[in-house]
């Protein structure tokens, strides 16, 4: 925001954009301005690559153990993210999740971003599942709406970017 000389926004306002594509966030964050979304996205990616170092993102406690237990019980675990494929796959590898996650769909793989159901629908189709056999777990309202729009059950996790209030539309909440 500073790099582009845009009006200051609060941390809370910026956090509400997490989950949206970088090309969609500017119009929501700065509706009064006529911004070039590609310039915003390119600037964000440049700064992200400059400041994002291995170890900058940490998993919450017990995540690997929980996901491993779910996989051991026969659940198929996938990730659909608006994050670029390159950074998403790097995170999965660096965080030691590669052996747990069956299928990964990044923002580059879909035409429509969250909350559109394209990512969920494509994942279900690729893996041969029906919506009623799936649960979308997420920490933003966009994740929950994506799951709802795809006809799946949804589970909001409040220890990420969302609050119980913002995730109230989820079928279940985990604190």
Place the predicted regions along the sequence by residue:
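Conserved phosphate-coupling serine/threonine residues in phosphotransfer and NTP-handling enzymes
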Residues: 81-83
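Acidic, Mg2+-coordinating phosphoryl-transfer loop and its flanking beta/alpha structural elements
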Residues: 135-173
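Conserved H-loop
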Residues: 7, 98-102, 130
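Conserved Lys-Pro-Asp/Glu-containing loop-to-beta segment of HAD-superfamily phosphomonoesterases
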Residues: 113-144
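Surface-exposed amphipathic alpha-helices with a cationic face
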Residues: 64-72, 124, 144-149
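Structural signature of beta-strand start/N-cap positions in the alpha/beta core
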Residues: 69, 73-76, 102-103, 133, ...
């Amino acid at each position: 925001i500073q790099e582009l000389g845009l009006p200051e926004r609060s941390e809370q306002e910026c956090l509400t954009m997490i989950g949206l594509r970088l090309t969609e966030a500017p119009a929501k964050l700065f509706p009064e301005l006529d911004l070039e979304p590609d310039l915003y996205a390119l600037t964000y990616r440049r700064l992200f690559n400059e400041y994002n170092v291995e170890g900058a993102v940490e998993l919450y406690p017990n995540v690997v153990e929980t996901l491993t237990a779910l996989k051991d019980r026969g659940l198929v675990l996938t990730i659909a993210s608006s994050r670029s494929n390159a950074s998403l796959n790097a995170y999965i590898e660096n965080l030691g999740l590669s052996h747990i996650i069956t299928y990964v769909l990044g923002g580059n793989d879909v035409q429509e971003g969250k909350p559109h159901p394209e990512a969920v629908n494509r994942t279900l189709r690729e893996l041969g599942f029906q919506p009623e056999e799936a649960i979308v777990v997420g920490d933003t309202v966009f994740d929950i709406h994506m799951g709802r729009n795809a006809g799946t059950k949804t589970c909001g996790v409040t220890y990420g970017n969302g609050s119980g209030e913002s995730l109230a539309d989820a079928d279940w909440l985990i604190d």
